[in-house]
């Protein structure tokens, strides 16, 4: 219901998930009883969060409620503009690396910025490194049906600096992130 409330108070137009998540952070900054969430902290530090499969989440239900209430004046999530925005970040970056938790749409989305940049006529380097934390297995079509080694065959990731971490993210990410 809070997602619906946030959306109800925005100008009706297409937003990227990054723009909408920033609005969630703004809302949390003023209204959250529990401070220091990831989204609020990202908002405070002006760190963008991209979620290319935003509608494939419980937050997506809030947007469905919002659109049901406001069929003619509603917001939408524009994943194509978001992909272009992320590709522009890749084009402007001197180098890039990936830390992916899980797989699916977000994994493909960020890896494909290299391919998209090239299709737009821009010369970009592969992602310098890639780490994927996942419990998925390619044998059953999970893991987006490919390991990072396959991504190197498409020119997305430098194969010499890729690492698959087959583990549950909540157990290993704190170890990776700690100092």
Predicted regions and their residues:
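Ligand-binding beta-strand-loop-alpha-helix segment within the catalytic cores
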Residues: 1-59
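Conserved active-site and cofactor/substrate-binding residues in soluble primary-metabolism enzymes
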Residues: 15, 19, 33, 37, ...
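Solvent-exposed alpha-helices and their adjacent loops that cap or buttress functional pockets
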Residues: 40-43, 90-93, 122-125
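Active-site rim loops that border cofactor/substrate pockets in soluble metabolic enzymes
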Residues: 52-97, 106
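A short acidic (Asp/Glu
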Residues: 60-63, 109-113, 142-144
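Gly/Ser/Thr-rich active-site loops/lids in small-molecule metabolic enzymes
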Residues: 71-85, 116-135
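C-terminal functional extensions of proteins
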Residues: 95, 105, 119-179
């Amino acid at each position: 219901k809070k997602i619906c409330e946030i959306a109800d108070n925005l100008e009706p137009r297409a937003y990227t998930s990054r723009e909408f998540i920033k609005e969630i952070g703004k809302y949390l900054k003023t209204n959250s009883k529990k401070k220091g969430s990831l989204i609020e902290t990202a908002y405070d530090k002006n760190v963008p969060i991209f979620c290319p499969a935003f509608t494939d989440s419980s937050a997506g239900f809030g947007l469905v409620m919002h659109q049901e209430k406001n069929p003619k004046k509603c917001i939408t999530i524009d994943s194509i503009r978001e992909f272009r925005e992320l590709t522009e970040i890749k084009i402007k970056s001197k180098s890039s690396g990936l830390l992916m938790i899980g797989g699916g749409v977000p994994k493909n989305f960020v890896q494909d910025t290299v391919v998209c940049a090239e299709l737009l006529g821009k010369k970009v380097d592969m992602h310098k490194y890639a780490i994927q934390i996942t419990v998925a297995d390619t044998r059953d079509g999970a893991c987006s049906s490919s390991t990072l080694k396959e991504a190197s065959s498409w020119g997305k990731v430098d194969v010499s600096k890729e690492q698959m971490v087959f583990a549950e993210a909540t157990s290993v990410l704190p170890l990776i992130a700690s100092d």
